[in-house]
Amino acid sequence: MLDRTIPFYNIILRCDRYLTTTPVLHNGYEFRMYQDGDERKWAQLEYEIGDFDSVDEAEQYFISTYCSKKALDITERCVFVVNEKNEIVGSCIAWKELRNDILVASLHWLVVSPQYQGKGIGKALCQKVMQIFVVNDEFPVYIHTQPWSYKAIILYVRQGFKIQKTDSFSQYENQFNFAMNTLKKILPENQYEELTYNIEL
């Protein structure tokens, strides 16, 4: 589970170019795209890791954010990983948000059920969603995250994302200094140094 006692600060990452990598899932897992009715399953997954106070709240968020945008088809942009029982165990969304009144690509809600973490599912989901951006030629790709998602941040920089000192998108205030100071306190020295090698002005 995420340690939400870690202070919250906005971290912005951006990927300008991506070398396509074939995602690999262990036997028993496979990708599938969003289908009607999956919003409840997505909501249960997000509630399970504590991102929302209730399943209903998460479901309403998904519907209002992703199912009402005519310009973007959620069935082509929301990727799930399912297990042998066809249960959703992970998800990630290839979306878009405004930056200076122009839509830019944004990777949303990379999440893996706690009991399925450590199996490479998050990495595979990230790679699968990045393929969507590649096919649609939608670069740069932005991510908004926070220090308590430090494991995901390390994954992102290993996939080619750079932590932004000043750049941002949507309504997010870039809180680079506060965020990096927080990460320095919680990460092993070698992991923090890896992040510092992936900072962009």
Predicted region positions:
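Acyl-donor-binding surface of acyltransferase catalytic domains
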Residues: M1-N27
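A short beta-loop-alpha structural element at the N-terminal edge
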Residues: E30-W42
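Hydrophobic adenine-recognition pocket in adenosine-nucleotide-binding enzymes
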Residues: Y34, L110-V112, T145
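A conserved beta-strand-loop-helix scaffold within acyl/acetyltransferase catalytic domains
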Residues: Y47-V112
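Conserved acetyl-CoA-binding loop-helix of GNAT-fold acetyltransferases
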Residues: W109-V112, G118-V135, I154-R158
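Conserved GNAT acetyl-CoA-binding A-motif
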Residues: F133-T145
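Conserved beta-strand-loop-alpha-helix junction that forms the acyl-donor binding cleft
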Residues: I143-I153, F169-M180
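Conserved acetyl-CoA-binding loop of GNAT-fold acetyltransferases
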Residues: V157-T166
